[in-house]
Amino acid sequence: MHNLRDFQPAKKPGTRSRFLQIVAEPDRTKRRKSRAKSKSQPKLTRVAFRVSRLMEFCTLRELQNQTGHSYEEWPLVVLKELMDNALDACEEAEVAPVISIAVGRSSIAIQDNAAGIDTGTIESILDYTIRVSSREAYVSPTRGAQGNALKTILAMGYVLDRERDDGNNNAEAVGVTIIETRGTKHAIEFAVDHIDNQPKITHTTTPSPITVGTKITVKWPAKAAVWGEGLLEWAEQGLKKLVESYAWFNPHLTLRGVWHGKQFIKVVATDPNWEKWRPRNPTSSHWYNKTQLQRYMAAHVARDRDRKRQRTVREFIAEFRGLSGTVVQRKVLDEVGCSHQSLAEFFGVEKVNRAGIAKLLASMRRHSKPVDPKHLGVIGADHLKQRFLAAGGNAETFKYDQRKGVTNEGIPYIIESAFGLHQSALTNDGVNSVPRKLITGANWSVGIVNPFRAFGRTGEGLEATLSKVRADSRAVICAVHLASAYVQYADRGKSSIILTNDAEQPDD
């Protein structure tokens, strides 16, 4: 409230009052008390804390984002990634893969017969500030190029050990992974430094009897559970199905699987000499667009800079299929005008030479032939029929189909499918028949879930197609595989493939 004295008539010098001016003055006593009180109250001075991005691997939510799968599916993620790595390693070593899988009550172990992993590569996997992959930036028919799969696997044990059913976190959580290769056992413990708030990794080595190939054992926390059931037991059927599915799409694979000491699968390769596009085969310039070639070139420039070397444009060109000869290299260099130029200089220092990269790509394509789809690798009717019969299929109902082509973007592909009825569907009117078996995958890897959920412009997927022919619930066996120089996924978990209209399902 204001006193009447606060309202004073306004006057001009030498004149009488003409209007009333209201001057509101706050109570001086209250104002002084307010200032005194403000000074006596404690104040918070905010500071900027540093939070490591590496913690993205150390929480349940973030690791689910990294893998693209919920924690209930992590046993399947571990198996898929380690199987893909083992198969790729065997093909790089140019040996027919012999892989064994053993699932215990608290561990998943996979062993291959490839060339093994050198210590430097293992140490780079433990560096969470970088992403290391021999398939990163390449465009080629490969099982995967995530680049951080092993990093996520190392962290899974810790995250599952950290999260408790009672809602509390285990401060002493640790994830344990063992890599045995080239006579050395690498024991890796993944934990967290709670002061620096970043991963703390302990790496110790001891002798190992494993001298051929690599054996990776992922320890699983005993308390990791789903609805009161151990996580590995929860995933048992999915794990066994995933293991079996790899045998469908890899004719050169000899495979053995053991569950709690009991063998559940043993498959001998139908064709140990089976040929497909291998990781060591040169990629084709026809598979890259301008953005992808720029990324691939940048990766080379960055690696050369780290290794303090200079690669020429000619050396870069020589890596591509059909461009290894000096005559064709000279034609490309002359057309682009980059003879005797280093790749780093051609790429650009202050600004990316996009026009030059586009011109180089056009010239490389002009002087090399596109890859025929058949060179990607055909699984074939004989192998798929053998797997079909082993799964209990009826030989007379077996059908095989193969479609191949090249997309509008120049990407070759082959789609193979095998279909037929299980024996149980032909007896007793299908009563007590087994459930439908659906095996799907791309580039000789297997999908954790069906990745063919949308075909071309129709938007309908494999499930809808099976429903149309009334095969959605009957005891049918259906396998679909896509081989392509470039597979585009709709999600990080690689659970849904984006198919262009070039690769629609057939009308018949």
Give the location of each predicted region:
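Conserved ATP-binding N-box helix of the HATPase_c
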Residues: Y71-V103, A149-M156
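GHKL-type ATPase core
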Residues: N3-G14, R18-I22, R28-R32, K39-V47, ...
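Glycine-rich G1-box
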Residues: A115-G116
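Helix-hairpin-helix
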Residues: R314-L333
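GHKL/Bergerat-fold ATPase module
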Residues: P13, S38, P221, L231, ...
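Acidic ATP/Mg2+-coordinating residue in the GHKL
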Residues: D112
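Conserved short strand/loop->alpha-helix "switch" segment adjacent to the catalytic nucleotide/phosphoryl-transfer site
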Residues: L54-L79, Y138
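Short adenine-binding "F-helix/F-box" segment of the Bergerat
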Residues: I122-L126
